[in-house]
Amino acid sequence: MPVLEIDLLDETNKLLDEDKQLVENILQFAAGYLKIDEGTELSLTFTTNEGIREINREYRNKDQATDVISFALEEMGEGETEIDWADFDLETPKMLGDIIISTEKAEEQAKDYGHTKARELGFLAVHGLLHLLGYDHMEPDEEKIMFGLQKEVLDAYGLER
């Protein structure tokens, strides 16, 4: 039984079914590997360089395309009040947030790094999932932890460089 409930949207209408399935399989594997609660939800959107550039500009003030952006729902934004969900008796599934991947950037990077587009999409999906779980790579020690875990998950799945 799948651990994650994944709401997948392909805005490009160009992604192959096997690529979508691979990314879903890797995310499900990663969720099990990382012991994420069953029924946890996330949304995954595949877009173009222009689509991700608009998001990057609007939400991160960076007017350029990037490979993956994650928006964690439990991450505190500036001026927001923290909600302690333990105070509520909720039977609703936990929603991690959104992962947005540029398929064009994934293709470019796959060529640059000399591996398949599928490997790059899997890498970006796991990278995005780790961000939703609170991992980051702004500091060298954080980067070592996050990238180490990312490699561990991808290697365990069998998607190596």
From Swiss-Prot:
Name assigned to this protein: Endoribonuclease YbeY
Gene that specifies this protein: ybeY
Organism: Listeria welshimeri serovar 6b (strain ATCC 35897 / DSM 20650 / CCUG 15529 / CIP 8149 / NCTC 11857 / SLCC 5334 / V8)
Family listed: Belongs to the endoribonuclease YbeY family.
Function: Single strand-specific metallo-endoribonuclease involved in late-stage 70S ribosome quality control and in maturation of the 3' terminus of the 16S rRNA.
Cofactor binding, per record: Binds 1 zinc ion.
Superkingdom, taxonomy of origin: Bacteria
Gene Ontology CC, one term: cytoplasm
Cofactor field: Zn(2+)
Keywords: Cytoplasm, Endonuclease, Hydrolase, Metal-binding, Nuclease, Ribosome biogenesis, rRNA processing, Zinc
